[in-house]
Structures are given as structure tokens and as C-alpha cells.
Regions:
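Sec-dependent bacterial lipoprotein signal peptides
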Residues: 1-12
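Short amphipathic alpha-helical surface micro-motifs
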Residues: 10-11, 42-49, 161-167, 199-202
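Short, compositionally biased
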Residues: 12-137, 210-226
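Terminal interaction module
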Residues: 15-19, 82-85, 171-226
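An exposed tryptophan-centered "aromatic clamp" motif
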Residues: 116-142, 146-201
Length: 226
């Protein structure tokens, strides 16, 4: 379990209650601290992600990394079920990303394998292979599901200014040149062989897209505050 400490300003009045909860806009630092934007000091803290969703009975607390992934394909080829859930309501991006990393299609036999021996002989998920590269206190980054990107979209007015303050790249909300469209880790349930869901950060809408198309992605991380 990830152990975190929350940096807070001392209350001006000893009778004033101190808020120990973690809220959207708080900053996850490389040393495991979660700090309020009001006490964040770039000379002291190294930011890695910004919180966009508090923990509840349906999902862990979630934070979005400061920078995004350049346009990349969901899959190398079509006609390839990559074993994601296909759910538009589950907060299961981590499980989906594991499926993307471990499900491969043999280029010769076109048989799906759970593990690959030589990546040159298998179709894979270029998107999925970009996840799990960063680790902070045993937590790994992954591609969010449809539902998780919905949470991020709802918090953008709070999160984007903090990302910018931390020196990161704000989530793109401009529809120009399809810049607002981001991959989810969720295949379209009715057509998992060929399509996955895109999410628009301009208006919160969703769109089915061929998995071989290239779009941006934004990785997230979850953690378990005590």
C-alpha cells in the first residue's frame, strides 16, 4: 500500500478544523507527498501528477500525469480482440492496460497469445506498451478507461491550471485538428476486434474509432491514502 503524507497549512485558529482529505488539484510529488497547491514549492517538491478524483467506494483516488503521450495507435492491426472489458462505466483502466500489454496476435498464425516471445512476430498495442514505465511508491501509470476519463473531464477547470503551474502540459480541450480527442483503454464492446473508445476533452463526448488510428493519450496513476 502506498503511504502518503499530506502537506497542509497550519490553521490560523487552533479551533479551526484542519482538512486532511485529498482533493482535486492537489499535487502528487516524487517523494510520495500529496500537497495542496497553496503550499506547493517547486524548490522543495518535484511534482509528478495532479489529483482529479477523490477515493470513494467505486475507485481509488486518481491523479493525471503532467505530460501526455503523442498520437499513437491503440493496436498494430484490426481484427484483434485485446481482451479489455468493453465497459463504459467501470473504473478499470489498470486492468484494461494489463490486457493491452499481455495480449498479442501472432503475425503468422493469427492466434492470440497471452505472452509474446519476440515482439517482431506479434501484433501488439503501441498505446498499451507506453504504460507502466513510471513507478512512484509501487504505483504504476496506466491508460484510463472511459469512466476514468469522464472523471478527469469533470475536474479539468481545477486540474489544468495546476498542471500548468507544475510545468506540465495541460489537457488539450481544443477541437482543432482533433487535439481534444484522447484514447481510453476501453474497446467498443460490440466491435472489440476493430474499435476502441475515444473521449473528447472539449465536451465530454465519446466516439468509436478504428484501433489502428493514432490519437493522444493521457496516463493516470491511482493510490491508496491511509
Amino acid at each position: 500500500m502506498m503511504v502518503l503524507s499530506v502537506g497542509l497549512l497550519a490553521a490560523c485558529d487552533e479551533h479551526e478544523p484542519v482538512d486532511l482529505d485529498i482533493h482535486p488539484g492537489y499535487i502528487l510529488c516524487s517523494d510520495g507527498q500529496i500537497v495542496s497547491p497553496s503550499v506547493f514549492d517547486a524548490g522543495v517538491h518535484t511534482p509528478v501528477a495532479v489529483v482529479f478524483a477523490e477515493k470513494n467506494d467505486k475507485h481509488q483516488a486518481l491523479a493525471v500525469l503532467l505530460d501526455e503521450i503523442a498520437p499513437v495507435a491503440f493496436a498494430d492491426t484490426l481484427s484483434f480482440d485485446q481482451k479489455t472489458s468493453g465497459s463504459e462505466t467501470e473504473y478499470d483502466g489498470y486492468v484494461n492496460t494489463v490486457a493491452l500489454q499481455t495480449t498479442h496476435l501472432d503475425r503468422d498464425s493469427l492466434v492470440v497469445k497471452d505472452n509474446k516471445a519476440d515482439p517482431r512476430n506479434y501484433y501488439t498495442s503501441p498505446l498499451g506498451l507506453l504504460a507502466f514505465r513510471h513507478h512512484w511508491f509501487f504505483q504504476s501509470d496506466y491508460v484510463p478507461s472511459v469512466a476514468e476519463l469522464g472523471l478527469l473531464y469533470s475536474a479539468l477547470t481545477v486540474v489544468n491550471p495546476v498542471i500548468k503551474r507544475c510545468g506540465g502540459t495541460p489537457v488539450n480541450r481544443s477541437p482543432e485538428n482533433a487535439g481534444c480527442w484522447y484514447w481510453t483503454s476501453t474497446e467498443v464492446a460490440q466491435n472489440k476486434l476493430n474499435q476502441a473508445w475515444l473521449f473528447s476533452m472539449a465536451d465530454g463526448s465519446r466516439h468509436k474509432a478504428p484501433k489502428t488510428n493514432s490519437y493522444r493519450a493521457r496516463l493516470i496513476v491511482e493510490y491508496n491514502p491511509l
